[in-house]
Amino acid sequence: MTLLVKGGRVVNPAMQQDEICDILIENGKIKEVGANLSADGAEIFDASGLVVAPGFIDMHVHLRQPGQSGKETIETGTKAAAAGGITRVATMPNTKPVIDSAIIVDGMKYKIEREAKVKVEIIGAISKGLQGQELAGMGAMAKEGVAAFSDDGRYVENCDFMRKAMEYASMFHKVIIDHCEEQSLVEGGNMHEGVVSNELGIKGRPAVAEDIAVARDIFLAEATHTPVHIAHISTKNAVELVRQAKKRGVQVTAEVTPQHLIFTDEVLRTFETRYKVNPPIRSEEHRAACVAGLQDGTIDAVVTDHAPHEWEEKDQEFNLAPSGFVGLETSVGAMLTYMYHTGNIDLMTLVNAMSTAQAKILGLDAGVIAPGKDADLTVLDLDKEWTVDSSKFYSKGKASPFDEMIFKGKAAATIVNGKIVMKNGEVL
């Protein structure tokens, strides 16, 4: 199959390329990038007036399989990704059973091959059962092709255990991803600890819990000369810790979510559970620090932490509702509306954070538009105005902090291995 993407503005951070050109695709691979390309019998995709970027990646997603198909499935989650312009996701291991062995990884690969609409990377657990007591079968999972290791949802408390995990993962050239909240400080907390939580009478999760955990991981990475990736960073001090560590040459990377860049804990005054997430949406000083971290490259990646729940779970008293909400179908619109169109970040920075940088962190041969590479592309309409309607999401999860908001900018098409899997909002 031959596809010719014509006349788009190609924004390609790996090449520092930002120009109008064509992309010729044959048999799932990029054959040529240049001006005035042609090919007999090719399907033409007119990208005039649109941005063509390397396929967007979301390295922090919960597809909820195995074991929680009421919340999400590989099929529904990857349809949501395609609808949102995401060509590849990495799914976290806090499932039932936990993805902590080669056998479970192999079963996941079988389902992914048959059900996924976009590419799916698997993240294996650091510890058996996410208990932080015994290392999971990391070597065997690495051989099965997992992209990274994480006990996401839980902080790896034991320092010596984490040190060993970092050293072991590095033997297989895999990165450790850590959910950084010191558990004794956040136990029972339901929102950011601060003025708003005090006024509402809700037990908070203090910023210092993240600061301590991030500092610990940075020092361990520095001591072991191994990489560590900080999941969903959300505090001012944590951002500064990463900034200074990078200056010292520590192999630390960090991600942030749209919700931590856009909202503050003031939205929690409504007691709406669609804003409840861990780490919590924080105060303005923390939000602004995250934006500054993305601007100067301290924060490498923008991810969703897409965490669907059944509606009955979220539709209950605030303190009882689980944390997490969906994000795959809104991340592009949210980032274009509140970060790009506001002048907070330029388009090259946005594309890098949502594609190229994530490929680099996970060691993937992706995130670049160049001959010989897989033809994974995200096509953006920067000026498309639309209203978020969670009832129409492909995801099973319908709780979204962005519901009913008006966005400017949307994914116009998603191309995976040279095949158009989404066009104008419809997953094909």
Residue ranges and their predicted role:
Residues 48-112:
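Metal-associated gating/positioning segment near the N- to mid-region
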Residues 133-302:
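Histidine/acidic residue-rich metal-binding segments in metalloenzymes
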